[in-house]
Every structure is written in structure tokens, then in C-alpha cells.
Amino acid sequence: MSTVQDYPSRLSRPESRKMGTFSYLPPMGEAEIRRQVEWIVKNGWNPGIEHTEPDFAAQIYWYMWKLPMFGETDVDAILAELKACHEANPGHHVRLIGYDNFTQSQGANMIVYRGTAV
């Protein structure tokens, strides 16, 4: 029987919280983020961008950056919007969501830029 490793994530320590599909993996570089955006587009999902303060990241509500990018297939345009959101909200977490029209749910959800915890 294998042992279960305790992950030291605590609500009292915002920098330790894990959120999103890839949060337990090492941070992704630009090339890996690009591949994930390409995958979202290839699946026909609609990208959406949200952001919030790190202290409130565990709550349900995040601020939506503009409207979801319905039908957007240009990966560079999606990456540019992610960067614009990060530049406008430098201390916030910025996440990319892939909305799946068929299942009417989120098909992907990942933090692209991590904010600084207070």
C-alpha cells in the first residue's frame, strides 16, 4: 500500500493554495500555455478570461475580463487578451477557461498568471 503525501496548502497562507487544472504541476512556460490555448481552440471551446485578487481566489466569484471570446480561433489574439488582463491587473490571478458548448460546462480551467499574495 502506498503512503499518501500531505500537501501543505492552508487557507491561512494564500501563496500555498492550489487552483486550476495544472496547479500541482510546475509552472508552464509560454510554449506550454500556447499549446493549451491551441488545444482549447482545436476542441471548439470558447475561451474566457477571469481574474481576482489572490486573497479571494478560493471564492466562487471571479471578475470576468471582457466577454467570453465566442468563436475565437486566433491563438495569438487569446494570448494577447491574457497578457492585457495581466497588465491591467498585475497583482491578480488570471485564469483561462475553455467553455464547452456541448456539455455546457467548463472543459478547461487553468491559472495563467499568478498574482502576489498579501
From Swiss-Prot:
Source organism superkingdom: Bacteria
Annotated coiled-coil segments of the chain: none
Pfam family, one: RuBisCO_small
InterPro entries linked to this entry: RuBisCO_ssu (IPR024681), RuBisCO_ssu_dom (IPR000894), RuBisCO_ssu_sf (IPR036385)
A molecular-function term among this protein's GO annotations: ribulose-bisphosphate carboxylase activity
Key word Manganese present: no
GO BP: reductive pentose-phosphate cycle
Record key words, sorted: Calvin cycle, Carbon dioxide fixation, Photosynthesis
Further remarks about this protein from its record: The basic functional RuBisCO is composed of a large chain homodimer in a 'head-to-tail' conformation. In form I RuBisCO this homodimer is arranged in a barrel-like tetramer with the small subunits forming a tetrameric 'cap' on each end of the 'barrel'.
Subunit organization: Heterohexadecamer of 8 large and 8 small subunits.
Family stated for the protein in its record: Belongs to the RuBisCO small chain family.
Role description: RuBisCO catalyzes two reactions: the carboxylation of D-ribulose 1,5-bisphosphate, the primary event in carbon dioxide fixation, as well as the oxidative fragmentation of the pentose substrate. Both reactions occur simultaneously and in competition at the same active site. Although the small subunit is not catalytic it is essential for maximal activity.
Identification of the protein by name: Ribulose bisphosphate carboxylase small subunit
Organism in which the protein naturally occurs: Rhodobacter capsulatus
Lineage: Bacteria, Pseudomonadati, Pseudomonadota, Alphaproteobacteria, Rhodobacterales
